[in-house]
Amino acid sequence: MTERVLVLPRDRVPGGYDFHGLRPADGAALDTLRVAVMTHGMYLDRPVAEDDPSHKQLIPYVVVRDGASVFLMHRTDAGGDPRLHGRASIGVGGHLNPVDEGEDALMAGLRREWDEELVTDWEPRFELVGLLNDDTNPVGAVHLGVVFTVEADGRAVAVREHDKLVGAFAVADEVAASWERLETWSSLVARELGLGP
């Protein structure tokens, strides 16, 4: 069965989509986005959505911090999207699917992605950072990130799918050492968080 993903028409992105990088947002902006999703969001077959830049696939994207460190992951070749093999990331997240449907699909999908991708024995507290847009490459052209941070406060975090990801907390110098392999979104967010060269 073909995966269906939540998309928002470009012209319905609150505040517009004509920006590059991370646009800071607050709770009011998140509420506006939620209303836009409830009003104009729709599900498309993923293969169709991947080739349709008139729509943005919404991706909740979470960066886990522990003080000055960030959870840095390296993707293996076992991951699903070959465009991302061998790349590094400071965020976890993924597509919103019909299983997330309801009054707050965005937050339901965010929580589902957290549980699918990470192993923790504590409850995360998601803090909105902003919207992330990058139309400079084929992956970014069809996605819109909704970026959150979570503070680990010294608590353990591990990746769930060891065959697809390897992860550990890293300080700014370690993130900088992986800079050339960072996915575009990760480099944009890392720079905003003061973790880039």
Predicted regions and their residues:
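Basic polyanion-binding and macromolecular-assembly surfaces
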Residues: 166-168
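Short amphipathic alpha-helices in soluble, non-transmembrane regions
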Residues: 160-163
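N-terminal leader/linker segments that precede catalytic domains of diphosphate-processing enzymes
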Residues: 1-158, 172-197
